[in-house]
UniProtKB/Swiss-Prot annotation:
Tagged with keyword Mitochondrion: no
Keywords assigned: ATP-binding, Cell inner membrane, Cell membrane, Cytoplasm, Membrane, Metal-binding, Nucleotide-binding, Protein transport, Translocase, Translocation, Transport, Zinc
Predominant cellular place of this UniProt entry's protein: membrane
Name of a matching Pfam family: P-loop_SecA
UniProt-recorded Gene Ontology molecular function terms: ATP binding; metal ion binding; protein-exporting ATPase activity
EC number of this enzyme: 7.4.2.8
Catalytic activity entry: ATP + H2O + cellular proteinSide 1 = ADP + phosphate + cellular proteinSide 2
Keyword Translocase recorded: yes
Gene Ontology BP, a term: protein transport by the Sec complex
Assembly notes: Monomer and homodimer. Part of the essential Sec protein translocation apparatus which comprises SecA, SecYEG and auxiliary proteins SecDF-YajC and YidC.
Protein name per Swiss-Prot or TrEMBL: Protein translocase subunit SecA
GO cellular component, one term: plasma membrane
Subcellular location: Cell inner membrane; Cytoplasm
Length: 912
């Protein structure tokens, strides 16, 4: 009550910030008459002037009003677009390292030019991050004219571009690209074998377009560079033949072999199903010994394959979660409806789907480098973002990224009408109403955009409209090449466009069609008369569409996130245009079926509703929003949980990448090698001759054998002990150290100091990279099963931190030992041989990168929900870890060895 009273008196925090920024807008507007009088040359001279002032110690905030005024005037002259006052406010919010929520059509692309220009003056690079390559290239081309005119360089990065072009793009003042490409290049840079092979400078300032899509929706999707592992894919094909013989249960307690947890995207075998699966696997020869059973340690790989195959068949649907194109399974983004070429699900899921669809099964991949978008973007010195829908996720932006959301007012009032949801008994009744609404709009000349949640639904609607003779366009993952053309025409009178989720996001739907696209089609040589005719025709269409009610949005299903629904609605009513929206739902929709309260469904059935009967009530809409909030909270927990775990990896990643940077920058690593050699020899001797020990405790024979096998150095320590009666452990350690130092000195004298320095650097880099790659594989295995510790009354996160630290320490010790072993044994005759070694390694590294893949880790799938429930004390189903162990068989009714007190079949012996 007190809070609401204070808000009424002083205004909300958002309103107070806007008032404060409006004072700067007044300053910028006051400068406009002076700036307008400058000649082109004088205006362009402002850029070097600003740079000099910054070099002299002035701050960006100090020059902001004048720099914004210069950028606005330059935009008016070069692009023919002048920034509105609200766009100036948006630019200031971005400069301050916050998120600007701006409605669709408010000119976010133009807004970004203000903070981009200002921050690029520092000369440390500005990254403008977009959701796809098309938008990156489009914005770089359009806005690049402005930046180039002002004396700043612009680059754009995209997959597969030549190395020299990418180096130039990152060296530019302003670089456009996708979140994937920036992240992928960051990982590639940290696999480079020389400083010259790296692209990026230090991550200085980034503006993320559609920031909610990248930092929220894709936060559960780590960037992974992976290469093929050694395991054959044959087992996926054999297990795939088993799964269709298992039967689905209608409920958890019903008859059958497995039941589906749709909320958690998991499949669980029943008791009967476990026995049936064992029987089928034995018949197929996949399990060799009937006495061992499915749960023996040596069969854990089969459990992993069976779990993946069950999920592939029972949960993942063709034309919903993926499409099959050119003999490959291509993932469809659940948020945008776009295909994610090159991405693959992890944990064997992608191979299981390939086996299900009968396409070639590719090998499982081994992680070479990995980072989440959360940790990637938190590395920027300053981060900001813009989107049309951020306020519903304001808490997550603040808690994860430290980014405040500021809602920017629209330039003109929004007049879109958002009608209440219409709820039907089943999908048939719902789609009948959708088709009737579409046909009505088409007859009245009102353009309509229909949002669907899957390719399957979009094609089903398309087929019905085709039969009804309604002309329409379909925009989904299968038509992505025509995306820009379809969106450009979506505002034509009577146009019907069916789009999966937010495909086409980033391009405005203009009432009457895109005038800019028509001008572009005319070409630069078009006469004024031709341009005038096109403008007149467009104005007539524009007015007709406005009179018909503007763009009408139809949602065929509510998304799990309110934000995605708001994005769809936001396509209508841009810049004060008229528009309307309505969602059509049924009790058979996923959200209603899984998450909505049971009373909604019971009430509708008790009222005796028929197929085409409809409920249109604000109370129902509120219940649906309540269900969405539950899902959003659940998904936030998953993302937060992922971040908590990845923060452990991130700390280790920073250490390794910092060491690589030091190695790449160093002229010589001799001091490093000398220090490592001392540590390795001390530890080696201590294993066989413990410090402060007596000779009866020594194992000189074992020490001699190890020195020869690992370092290639025969050393007669037993003879030495016979001839020197007063020899102690410290003297032996000193003798070994002296001998090893002499061995290295001889090697250096033979090949020359320069050759030895080059060899040391090459070996250290190669061994560190190999050790890190193997460590990542161990961390993956640890991560997959760590939450099982919760059943033994242990904190999984604390256990993960402890064991991850132990693994990391072990890896560093192994790297040290391997570096010294290799340097001691390698035989090099000339510097040319070292150069050839480095070149060979570089070629192999490039080949690995070419063969590597950008992998889509479905963190919301295998184990993610169970981890969250386990952290919160829930009783989650337990997947089996993939780590193989040679242990005696445990009976299914025996107590579980983990110490939980449960039977083995209900604990670590349960299949999820």
């Amino acid at each position: 009550m007190i809070n609401s009273l204070l808000t009424r008196v002083f205004g909300s925090r958002n309103e107070r910030q806007l008032r404060q920024l409006n004072r700067l807008v007044t300053q910028i507007n006051a400068l406009e008459p002076t700036i307008e009088k400058l000649s082109d040359a004088e205006l362009q001279a402002k850029t070097p002037e600003f740079k000099q002032r910054l070099a002299a110690g002035e701050s960006l905030d100090k020059i902001l009003p004048e720099a914004f005024a210069v950028c606005r005037e330059a935009s008016r002259r070069v692009l023919g677009m002048r920034h509105y006052d609200v766009q100036l406010i948006g630019g200031m919010v971005l400069h301050l390292g916050k998120i600007a929520e701006m409605r669709t059509g408010e000119g976010k692309t133009l807004v970004a030019t203000l903070p981009v220009y200002l921050n690029a003056l520092e000369g440390q690079g500005v990254h403008v991050v977009t959701v796809n390559d098309y938008l990156a290239r489009r914005d770089a081309a359009q806005m690049g004219k402005l930046y180039n005119w002002l004396g700043l360089s612009v680059g754009v990065v995209y997959p597969g571009m030549p190395h020299s072009d990418k180096h130039a793009a990152y060296a530019a003042d302003i670089t456009y690209g996708t979140n994937n490409e920036f992240g992928f290049d960051y990982l590639r840079d940290n696999m480079a074998l020389s400083r010259a092979d790296r692209y990026q400078r230090k991550l200085h300032y980034a503006i993320v377009d559609e920031v909610d899509s990248i930092l929220i929706d894709e936060a559960r999707t780590p960037l992974i560079i992976s290469g093929p592992a050694d395991e054959s894919p044959e087992l996926y094909i054999r297990v795939n033949r088993i799964v269709p013989q298992l039967t689905k249960q209608e409920s958890e307690e019903g008859e059958g072999d497995y039941w589906i947890d749709e909320k958690g995207k998991q499949v669980h075998l029943s008791e009967a199903g476990m026995g049936h699966a064992e029987e089928l696997l034995l018949q197929a020869g996949i399990l060799e010994n009937a006495d061992d059973g499915l749960y023996a340690a040596q069969n854990l790989s089969v459990v992993h394959h069976l779990n993946a195959a069950l999920r592939a068949h029972a949960i993942y649907q063709r034309d919903v979660d993926y499409i099959v194109r050119d003999g490959e399974v291509v993932i469809v983004d659940e948020f945008t409806g776009r295909t994610l070429s090159g991405r693959r699900w992890s944990d064997g899921l992608h191979q299981a789907v390939e086996a299900k669809e009968g396409v070639p099964v590719q090998r499982e991949n081994q992680t070479l480098a990995s980072i989440t978008f959360q940790n990637l973007f938190r590395m920027y010195k300053k981060l900001s973002g813009m989107t049309g829908t951020a306020d519903t996720e304001a808490y997550e932006f603040q808690s994860i990224y430290g980014l405040e959301v500021v809602v920017i007012p629209t330039n003109r009032p929004t007049v879109r009408k958002d009608h209440p949801d219409q709820v039907f008994l089943n999908r048939k009744g719902k789609f009948n109403a959708v088709l009737a609404d579409i046909e009505d709009c088409a007859k009245r000349g009102q353009p309509v955009l229909v949002g669907t949640t899957s390719i399957e639904t979009s094609e089903m609607l398309s087929e019905h409209l085709r039969k009804a003779g309604v002309k329409h366009e379909v925009l989904n993952a299968k038509q992505h090449e025509r995306e820009a053309t379809i969106v450009a025409n979506a505002g034509q009178p009577g146009a019907v466009t069916i789009a999966t989720n937010m495909a086409g996001r980033g391009t405005d739907i203009v009432l009457g069609g895109s005038l800019e696209a028509e001008y572009h089609a005319l070409g630069e040589d078009a006469t004024e008369e031709a341009r005038f005719k096109i403008k007149t025709d467009w104005q007539r269409r524009h007015d007709a569409v406005k009179a018909a009610g503007g763009l009408h949005i139809i949602g065929t299903e509510r998304h799990e996130s309110r934000r995605i629904d708001n994005q769809l609605r936001g396509r209508a009513g841009r810049q004060g245009d008229p528009g309307s929206s309505r969602f059509y739902l049924s009790l058979e929709d996923n959200l209603m079926r899984i998450f909505a309260s049971d009373w909604v469904q019971k009430a509708m059935r008790m009222m005796g509703m028929k197929e085409d009967d409809v409920i249109e009530d604000r109370l129902v809409s509120r219940q649906i929003e309540k269900a969405q909030r539950k899902v959003e909270a659940h998904n936030f927990d998953i993302r937060k949980n992922l971040l908590d775990f990845d923060d452990v990896n991130n700390d280790q990643r920073k250490v390794i990448y910092a060491q690589r940077d030091d190695l790449l920058d160093a002229e010589s690593v001799k001091d490093n090698v000398d220090g490592i050699r001392g540590d390795v020899i001390y530890d080696l001797v201590a294993r066989f001759v413990p410090p402060n020990s007596v000779d009866e405790q020594w194992d000189l024979q074992g020490l001699e054998a190890t020195l020869e096998s690992e370092l290639g150095m025969p050393l007669a320590l037993r003879e030495l002990a016979k001839t020197q009666e007063e020899l102690d452990a410290e003297q032996i350690a000193a003798k070994v150290q002296t001998a090893v130092d002499a061995h290295f000195a001889e090697k250096e004298a033979a090949v020359g100091a320069d050759t030895m320095r080059a060899l040391e650097k090459h070996v250290m880099l190669t061994v560190l990279d190999q050790g890190w790659k193997e460590h990542l594989a161990k961390m993956d295995y640890l991560r997959q099963g760590i939450y099982l510790r919760g059943y033994a009354q242990k904190q999984p996160k604390q256990e993960y931190k402890k064991e991850a630290f132990e693994l990391f320490s072990e890896m560093l010790e192994n790297v040290k030992r391997e570096v010294i072993n290799l340097l001691a044994r390698v035989r090099i005759r000339s510097e040319e041989e070292v150069a050839e070694l480095e070149e060979q390694e570089r070629r192999q590294a490039e080949a690995r990168l070419l063969a590597s893949q950008f992998q889509h880790q479905d963190a919301g799938g295998y184990g993610a929900d169970e981890e969250v429930e386990q952290m919160q004390g829930g009783n989650a189903p337990v997947p089996v870890s993939q780590v193989t162990r040679d242990e005696p068989k445990v009976g299914r009714n025996d107590p579980c060895p983990c110490g939980s007190g449960k039977k083995y079949k209900h604990c670590h012996g349960q299949l999820s």
